[in-house]
């Protein structure tokens, strides 16, 4: 097994202390509080809060239990873990392919940490900022309404190259999903032919069985921590009613009464919370009814979701952010999808499609609300989402978007994008990131630095840090929903940077825009020392070749201007 403490950075600062148990930093958290006066003026009050942030250095042995383990995403994740663990290679038409984790921000993206002696940007892999779970050490288990073992489930999914499937089939054939909860009222009727591996009994009996399964997995595998993640079929929305599920006590009573509106995904979430396991919802249904959120808060167990943000929606959250930020007014967004995998088959039913439509439609709301120069209080773009089931295209989802925007003097600009997404190969790395960052979040705490008696405080149970990976981010009550991909990514980077005593990335680069020789005798460098084997990161300055854009794409580019792009 590979070592789990893969952090290779040492920050040289009196504000950073490292011992066998924790990385602890003294951190000045700076924000601005805005007040509106009676005459409409905005008064901005900069604020600084002195904090201590500590991160546990011990990385636990992590177990991941997938609901829908035998589906496209579950079988692909299991296959990818095996292929990467064995560093497999296989032949394709275009040559030899090696197993990798492209599409994962923890495994295949880098983070800016500072500038070197030549003024060049230095990036390191995100996974090296803090001790994180190594994917090779993750143990997977789970449930599925289909009893196929994982080898046959992988073949049924038709996602991976056959040359790879043949190398790992025997290993995956030894893995078989536990029986799962099947309620035909919540998923499409066309899924009934798969349902040969189900938990019988009342909802309470199903809940108790899921709890037993989690305990059994923990004991048999010897894992220290378990995360449960829903990657099964999209359910219809459950009704939310007083007396049914608006409080934790109502929800528990409804479970005990076998109420028909307690969905399978909510039962899984309740069981996970009862066992102290982080629960992540990768589908768009309203698993997290108010009573479930309250239950997680009472038990202080993390929940996160909703719905993997992998393809069309991720592009939409970037493009609309760009347009609105550029002072261009999107007035119409039409999104069309067709796909042929089992997700598409399930979504061909109207109630299940409605769950997905809601998830995909709300992604631009916060960006529209950010610019009242473009939009009035109740104004927003026309936004329509269409999903169709076309069996022949399989997992190769086709997404077509048309963005119409108003520009200067009544002009219009139209952007049309065609996006072919291999659905499960985009979603699977997100699952990996969700469980790795979800586990890391359990080891991060902070407290008031000015009060020695102040308690250490963890993240709130609604883990909004994972919003970057979700179409419809779940946030704590009273918090603002952020869909802007740039802001979501910046939150992850800056929190990880704060955990090792580095300031937020500001992009001010004052040392490049002003003559610092008249200000200080010291070079304007972050004092960061790389220990062990240094990262293979080149710089770009004045026409030199470099890989300083945060990507390792195998090709060095020549800088042709002085702006670093």
Swiss-Prot record:
<feature type="binding site">
    <location>
        <position position="233"/>
    </location>
    <ligand>
        <name>NAD(+)</name>
    </ligand>
</feature>
<keyword id="KW-0413">Isomerase</keyword>
<keyword id="KW-0594">Phospholipid biosynthesis</keyword>
<feature type="binding site">
    <location>
        <position position="72"/>
    </location>
    <ligand>
        <name>NAD(+)</name>
    </ligand>
</feature>
<feature type="binding site">
    <location>
        <position position="231"/>
    </location>
    <ligand>
        <name>NAD(+)</name>
    </ligand>
</feature>
<keyword id="KW-0398">Inositol biosynthesis</keyword>
<feature type="binding site">
    <location>
        <position position="356"/>
    </location>
    <ligand>
        <name>NAD(+)</name>
    </ligand>
</feature>
<feature type="binding site">
    <location>
        <position position="181"/>
    </location>
    <ligand>
        <name>NAD(+)</name>
    </ligand>
</feature>
<feature type="compositionally biased region" description="Polar residues">
    <location>
        <begin position="550"/>
        <end position="565"/>
    </location>
</feature>
<dbReference type="InterPro" id="IPR013021">
    <property type="entry name" value="Myo-inos-1-P_Synthase_GAPDH"/>
</dbReference>
<feature type="binding site">
    <location>
        <position position="424"/>
    </location>
    <ligand>
        <name>NAD(+)</name>
    </ligand>
</feature>
<feature type="binding site">
    <location>
        <position position="282"/>
    </location>
    <ligand>
        <name>NAD(+)</name>
    </ligand>
</feature>
<feature type="binding site">
    <location>
        <position position="307"/>
    </location>
    <ligand>
        <name>NAD(+)</name>
    </ligand>
</feature>
<feature type="binding site">
    <location>
        <position position="395"/>
    </location>
    <ligand>
        <name>NAD(+)</name>
    </ligand>
</feature>
<feature type="binding site">
    <location>
        <position position="70"/>
    </location>
    <ligand>
        <name>NAD(+)</name>
    </ligand>
</feature>
<feature type="binding site">
    <location>
        <position position="394"/>
    </location>
    <ligand>
        <name>NAD(+)</name>
    </ligand>
</feature>
<keyword id="KW-0520">NAD</keyword>
<dbReference type="Pfam" id="PF01658">
    <property type="entry name" value="Inos-1-P_synth"/>
</dbReference>
<comment type="similarity">
    <text>Belongs to the myo-inositol 1-phosphate synthase family.</text>
</comment>
<feature type="binding site">
    <location>
        <position position="191"/>
    </location>
    <ligand>
        <name>NAD(+)</name>
    </ligand>
</feature>
<feature type="binding site">
    <location>
        <position position="144"/>
    </location>
    <ligand>
        <name>NAD(+)</name>
    </ligand>
</feature>
<feature type="binding site">
    <location>
        <position position="310"/>
    </location>
    <ligand>
        <name>NAD(+)</name>
    </ligand>
</feature>
<feature type="region of interest" description="Disordered">
    <location>
        <begin position="546"/>
        <end position="565"/>
    </location>
</feature>
<keyword id="KW-0963">Cytoplasm</keyword>
<comment type="function">
    <text>Key enzyme in myo-inositol biosynthesis pathway that catalyzes the conversion of glucose 6-phosphate to 1-myo-inositol 1-phosphate in a NAD-dependent manner. Rate-limiting enzyme in the synthesis of all inositol-containing compounds.</text>
</comment>
<feature type="binding site">
    <location>
        <position position="73"/>
    </location>
    <ligand>
        <name>NAD(+)</name>
    </ligand>
</feature>
<keyword id="KW-0443">Lipid metabolism</keyword>
<protein>
    <recommendedName>
        <fullName>Inositol-3-phosphate synthase</fullName>
        <ecNumber>5.5.1.4</ecNumber>
    </recommendedName>
</protein>
<feature type="modified residue" description="Phosphoserine">
    <location>
        <position position="536"/>
    </location>
</feature>
<comment type="pathway">
    <text>Polyol metabolism; myo-inositol biosynthesis; myo-inositol from D-glucose 6-phosphate: step 1/2.</text>
</comment>
<keyword id="KW-1208">Phospholipid metabolism</keyword>
<feature type="binding site">
    <location>
        <position position="232"/>
    </location>
    <ligand>
        <name>NAD(+)</name>
    </ligand>
</feature>
<feature type="binding site">
    <location>
        <position position="423"/>
    </location>
    <ligand>
        <name>NAD(+)</name>
    </ligand>
</feature>
<feature type="binding site">
    <location>
        <position position="234"/>
    </location>
    <ligand>
        <name>NAD(+)</name>
    </ligand>
</feature>
<feature type="binding site">
    <location>
        <position position="180"/>
    </location>
    <ligand>
        <name>NAD(+)</name>
    </ligand>
</feature>
<feature type="binding site">
    <location>
        <position position="341"/>
    </location>
    <ligand>
        <name>NAD(+)</name>
    </ligand>
</feature>
<feature type="binding site">
    <location>
        <position position="343"/>
    </location>
    <ligand>
        <name>NAD(+)</name>
    </ligand>
</feature>
<keyword id="KW-0444">Lipid biosynthesis</keyword>
<feature type="binding site">
    <location>
        <position position="283"/>
    </location>
    <ligand>
        <name>NAD(+)</name>
    </ligand>
</feature>
<feature type="binding site">
    <location>
        <position position="194"/>
    </location>
    <ligand>
        <name>NAD(+)</name>
    </ligand>
</feature>
<dbReference type="GO" id="GO:0006021">
    <property type="term" value="P:inositol biosynthetic process"/>
</dbReference>
<dbReference type="GO" id="GO:0004512">
    <property type="term" value="F:inositol-3-phosphate synthase activity"/>
</dbReference>
């Amino acid at each position: 097994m590979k070592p789990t403490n893969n952090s290779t950075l040492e920050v040289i600062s009196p504000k950073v202390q490292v011992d066998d148990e924790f990385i602890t930093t003294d951190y000045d958290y700076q924000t601005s509080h805005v007040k509106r006066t009676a005459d409409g003026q905005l008064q901005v009050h900069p604020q600084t809060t002195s904090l201590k942030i500590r991160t546990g250095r011990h990385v636990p042995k992590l177990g991941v239990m997938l609901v829908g383990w035998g589906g496209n995403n579950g079988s692909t994740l299991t296959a990818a873990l095996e292929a990467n663990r064995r560093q497999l290679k296989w032949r394709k038409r275009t040559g030899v392919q090696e197993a990798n984790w492209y599409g994962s921000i923890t495994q295949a993206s880098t983070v800016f940490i500072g500038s070197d002696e030549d003024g060049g940007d230095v990036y390191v892999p995100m996974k090296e900022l803090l001790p994180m779970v190594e994917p090779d050490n993750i143990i997977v288990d789970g449930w599925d309404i289909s009893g196929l073992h994982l080898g046959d489930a992988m073949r049924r999914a038709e996602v991976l190259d056959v040359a790879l499937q043949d190398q790992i089939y025997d290993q995956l054939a030894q893995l078989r999903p536990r029986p799962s909860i099947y309620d035909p009222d919540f998923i499409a009727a066309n899924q009934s032919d798969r349902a040969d591996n189900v938990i019988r009994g009342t909802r309470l009996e199903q809940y108790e069985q899921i709890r037993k399964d989690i305990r059994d997995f923990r004991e048999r595998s010897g894992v220290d921590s378990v995360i449960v993640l829903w990657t099964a079929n999209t359910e219809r929305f459950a009704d939310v009613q007083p007396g049914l599920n608006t409080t934790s006590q109502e929800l528990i009573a409804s479970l005990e009464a076998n109420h028909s509106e307690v969905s399978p995904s909510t039962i899984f979430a309740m069981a996970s919370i009862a066992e102290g396991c982080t629960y992540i919802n990768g589908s768009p249904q309203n698993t997290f009814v108010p009573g479930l959120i309250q239950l997680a808060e009472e038990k202080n167990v993390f929940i996160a979701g909703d719905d993997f943000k992998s393809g069309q929606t991720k592009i939409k959250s970037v493009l609309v952010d760009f347009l609105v930020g550029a002072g261009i007014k999107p007035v119409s967004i039409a999104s069309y999808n067709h796909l042929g995998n089992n997700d598409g088959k399930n979504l061909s039913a109207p109630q299940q499609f409605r769950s997905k439509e809601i998830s995909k439609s709300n992604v631009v709301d916060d960006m529209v609300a950010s610019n009242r120069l473009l939009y009035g209080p109740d104004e927003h773009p026309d936004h329509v989402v269409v999903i169709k089931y076309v069996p022949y295209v399989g997992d190769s989802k086709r997404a077509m978007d048309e963005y119409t925007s108003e520009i200067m003097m009544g002009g219009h600009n139209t952007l049309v994008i065609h996006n072919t997404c291999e659905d499960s190969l985009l979603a699977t790395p997100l699952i990996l990131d969700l469980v790795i960052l979800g586990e890391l979040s359990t080891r991060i705490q902070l407290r008031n630095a000015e009060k020695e008696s102040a308690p250490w405080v963890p993240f709130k149970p609604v883990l909004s840090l994972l919003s970057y990976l979700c179409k419809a981010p779940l946030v704590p009550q009273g918090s603002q929903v952020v869909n802007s991909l740039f802001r979501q990514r910046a939150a992850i980077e800056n929190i990880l940077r704060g955990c090792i005593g580095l300031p937020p990335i500001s992009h001010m680069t004052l040392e490049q825009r002003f003559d610092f020789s008249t200000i200080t005798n010291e070079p304007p460098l972050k004092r960061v020392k790389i220990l062990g084997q240094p990262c293979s990161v080149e710089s770009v300055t004045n026409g030199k070749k470099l890989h300083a854009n945060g990507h390792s794409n195998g090709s060095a580019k020549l800088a042709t201007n002085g702006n670093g792009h």
